[in-house]
Amino acid sequence: MSPNGWIILDKPLGLGSTQAVGAVKRVCREAGLGKVKVGHGGTLDPLATGVLPIALGEATKLCGRMLDASKVYRFTTCYGIETDTLDLEGKVIREVDSVVGIVDDAAVEDVLARFIGPIEQTPPAFSAIKVDGQRAYDLARAGAEVTLNSRTVTIHALDYVESWWQEGKLYATLEAHVSKGTYIRSLARDLAHAMGTFGHVTMLRRLKAGPFGIEQAISLDKLNEVGKGAPLENVLLPLEAGLVDIPALNLGPEQARAIRQGRVLAGLPHTDGLYWAKAGTVPVALVELFGGTATVVRGFNLPDVAE
């Protein structure tokens, strides 16, 4: 039986999100599971580590929902230097000799409150955004001048963690809870500019993506154990683990049959909103309730659904 559910990978440094998906596919083949549909719920740059939700089977139908979810990151900024990529990988384009007397711990903490809530943010030139059909990072690497439009994103929370001095540069680690579409590299740049200096990201770790936290994440070594004979169940979370942030709608056998056939259910005594409908413990579909009527948003083809 083909697996359906989530593997939450603690993505290591240097591994791309597409490579991580490839690693899961390889492990499934090695485990004798055959060809498994696999997708990820939110790109994480190779220079970033942490939570990368990887969907298997029917859970891939929820990848789009995961992309729209908010994220939590911990990141370190080096103040006094800005690079073209806004991280360690790039070429230095702006620099000051020292930030002593310009930036200190208090300045970092003081500026955070100004960035809470909806803000306008310009994405990095080195990003996956498409410009006239081409990725911005491809154009930037080719030497083209890339100008991206600003966008409105939301910073739900921004907290100071720690800071230290090294060779005349201040390093500060912050934790940010952000909406979809937020670039942490741009946030670090803009925070530095607000302090009157420059900055680039030296460490980026995703602690949470949607309902999934770092405490649920497994290492690449743990994943590889599945390819060597360990049970997939050791690392696979159920499909409904990606739905814990919305309420469940319990269905009887006839209701489950109707939903699986794409029909609407009327006369339900529930408030309007998004629900995941289930028959027993088995997810049947995502449904939208309005005026007591449930309409299928996305159906799941899972075994043991009441017929």
Label for each model-derived stretch:
Residues R65-P123:
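Acidic, low-complexity central loop/insert segments
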Residues A128, R135, L170-P211:
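Pseudouridine synthase
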Residues I54, F75, G133, L187, ...:
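Residue-level signal for inorganic ion chemistry
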Residues K37-L67, D138, A142:
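Glycine/acidic-rich beta-strand-loop module
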Residues F126-S127, V131-H156:
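Extended alpha-helical targeting/anchoring segments
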Residues M1-L47, A69, Y171, A194-E307:
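Accessory RNA 3′-end/elbow-binding domains used by RNA modification enzymes
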Residues T152-A172:
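Helix-hairpin-helix/helix-loop-helix acidic hairpins
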